[in-house]
Design a protein with these regions (language model features):
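Active-site-proximal substrate-binding groove within the catalytic cores of carbohydrate-active enzymes
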Residues: 145-156, 373-570
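Active-site mouth loops of central-metabolism enzymes
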Residues: 200-212, 306-320, 441-448
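Short, acidic/polar
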Residues: 208-223, 317-330, 452
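Aromatic- and carboxylate-enriched substrate-binding clefts and catalytic-loop regions
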Residues: 230-440, 477
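Sec-dependent N-terminal signal peptides
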Residues: 1-10
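Residues within well-ordered alpha-helices
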Residues: 217, 260-263, 455
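N-terminal accessory beta-strand-rich subdomains and adjacent acidic, glycine-rich linkers
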Residues: 12-178, 533-537, 545
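An acidic-aromatic substrate-binding cleft motif
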Residues: 178-220, 224-228, 232, 236-237
Length: 570
């Protein structure tokens, strides 16, 4: 172990070069920095800050430069593409409800040559991971306490570096597993129902939802094999102007749902579990509760969406939210929740609590309060229904989120089948046993059913969520959906629990494989590729856009005929 202790700055030599840490405005803070080696051979930077008094911690920055050798691409869980960026254009941030502090740098042969992971997955971190033009070096930076932070007297954290060449997918999984172990994260239970095909009201209905319409739609969904339903925004308001001005009272619109409990029961009688959407932080400016919580907001009008953002550092705010969900669960006997917009718990400038000396707040750190809130929600709901389903949406998909959510969904990407595929694969690598869901699928019914099937195939390595208006769908489209739902359930264990290998992230995974003891399933999403097929029973889902593809099996190359939008057993 190498250790350097200084008042304001520290440095240590790692296998890839020097790592430096420094503090600004230390004001009595002492910095300790040590290099350690993990049992698996990765290198760990341990950073400790101590102060004799309770004070706002100093801005702290870790930096390193690594020769750009073999590192042609970069990855993190919320990336839109994997292109390397210059250091001045490679900035991002993570916290409890934003992203994941894991970064992998790799080549075009699915080999990682350098990865970085930070233990801190609750508080705000700033990141840099880009190329410094002078010298063609990868510049790494991590910043702590650069946004408003509560006073503390001690802080300890670790950063993991892995400069060994290894498979890209293994590098991601190992980094995430290290965070979970080091940060003491215990993921919540994932019921089997979290992996059932799902129907969402959002893209097809938006806010214009009515009980009778939904029940008619879900009767069709049930026949096709869907098992879960999410009623999204609209059930709580008569307004259809988008925005969130009427959120926060959480009273059912009687015009839309005259008897919510009876409606839920009718849907459940179809064999479908019922989940409800809530925008967790929002209190609409036109809601009755807006005046009640004045003075207890961190943001007066989030992004101009007509809603203020609650401050969960107030215990009465957390109690209000927990009680709201518990009441819904008890009153309507629902099966789960889509808890939305928790990334909106953020400051629009300075922390308003500082001027008030944190009056009324039992927690001073906002990210820590968000973590406490979601833990209290999970504990309250599972005490009533242990198999409760809880969905969170990208980009709040970090390690801490898995403590309270068992369904992690791709962020909104309507009509973007490639983005759905890419994000599903990223989440699968980074989310352990959580059920990874596609963004809701929709397509134009003027498409051929074979072309519409491409949307489904691109999402098959996650739990597929559908949001097309089934009652208006041509019968050929319904038959296509039913066919693929059956395939997904016949091969569910392989698709969702098998060894998962997505290839070439720099190309957004043109080939994805899943393998179980009994079979291999391959998704082909690009033409002109030779697909390596093992001797084991193999299914290829063809979304290449071509009606044939080339395989290599047992050293022999041959062409296989299979319609695009279909699958074949080999």
């Amino acid at each position: 172990m190498t250790s350097v202790i200084l008042a304001a700055a520290a440095a240590a030599t790692f296998s890839f070069g020097e790592v430096k840490v420094h503090c600004e405005d230390r004001d009595g803070w002492k910095l300790a920095f040590a290099r350690e080696v993990a049992p698996d051979g990765a290198e760990i930077a341990k950073i400790t800050l101590d102060c004799a008094e309770t004070k706002i911690p100093p801005k702290t920055w870790l930096s390193a430069k690594v020769p750009q050798v073999g590192m042609d691409y970069s990855w993190n869980v919320n990336t839109g593409d994997c292109g390397m960026r210059p250091n001045w254009g490679a900035r991002s941030h993570t916290e409890v409800a934003q992203g994941m502090p894991v970064f992998v740098f790799f080549d075009g042969n699915d080999t990682s040559h350098f990865s970085v992971a930070a233990e801190e997955c609750v508080r705000h971190l700033n990141h840099v991971g880009g190329i410094r033009e002078e010298g063609s070096a990868l510049e790494i930076g991590i910043g702590w306490f650069e946004t408003p932070e509560a006073p503390i007297s001690h802080y300890e954290t670790r950063v993991r570096f892995d400069a060994r060449a290894k498979g890209f997918a293994d590098a991601v999984r190992e980094a995430v597993a290290w965070i979970e172990k080091t940060a003491g994260i215990v993921p919540c239970r994932v019921p089997d129902a979290a992996c059932d095909p799902l129907y969402s009201s959002w893209y097809n209905f938006h806010q214009d939802v009515f009980a009778a319409d939904l029940e008619a739609e879900l009767a069709i969904a049930a026949k096709l094999g869907m098992k879960t339903f999410i009623v999204d925004d609209g059930w709580q308001t008569d307004d259809t102007n988008r925005g969130y001005a009427f959120c926060g009272d959480w009273q059912v619109s009687k015009r839309r749902f005259p008897d919510m409990a009876a409606h839920v029961k009718r849907v459940q009688d179809l064999g479908i579990k019922y989940m409800m959407w809530y925008s967790v932080p929002f209190i609409g400016l036109k809601s009755a509760n807006y005046e009640k919580f004045k003075g207890k907001y961190v943001n007066g009008n989030d992004r101009g969406m007509g809603a203020a953002v609650l401050d969960p550092r107030f215990p009465e705010v957390r109690k209000f939210l927990v009680d709201t969900y518990v009441k819904a669960l008890k009153d309507w006997n629902i099966d789960g929740f889509k808890l939305d917009f928790i990334d909106a718990f953020r400051f629009a400038g300075e922390d308003p609590a500082v001027k008030e000396n944190y009056a009324g707040r039992d927690i001073k750190s906002l990210p820590v309060a968000v973590d406490r809130l979601m833990t209290e929600v999970k504990d309250a709901l599972t005490a009533i229904k242990p198999d409760i389903l809880v969905e969170f949406r990208q980009s709040y998909v970090g390690p801490a989120i898995r403590k309270y959510g068992n369904m992690l969904r791709v962020g909104d990407c309507p009509g973007n089948l490639r983005r759905n595929r890419f994000a599903i694969a990223n989440l699968r690598l980074a989310s352990g046993s959580a059920a990874v869901h596609s963004d809701m699928l929709e397509w134009n019914f003027a498409e051929s059913p074979e072309h519409a099937a491409l949307y489904v195939i691109n999402s098959m390595f996650g739990v597929v969520q559908y949001s097309v208006m089934l009652r208006n769908a041509p019968k050929e489209h319904l038959a296509m959906v039913e066919k693929w739902i059956k395939f997904s359930q016949d091969h569910r264990d392989t698709l969702l629990n098998g060894k998962f290998t997505p290839r070439h992230p720099e190309l957004q995974y043109p080939v994805i494989e899943a393998e179980s003891d009994k079979e291999v399933i391959i998704g082909l999403y690009d033409d002109g590729r030779i697909v390596d097929v093992p001797a084991k029973k193999t299914f290829v889902m063809n979304a290449s856009g071509k009606d044939s593809f080339v395989i290599r099996r047992g050293g022999k190359i041959s062409e296989v005929s299979c319609k695009s939008g279909d699958w074949i057993e080999l």
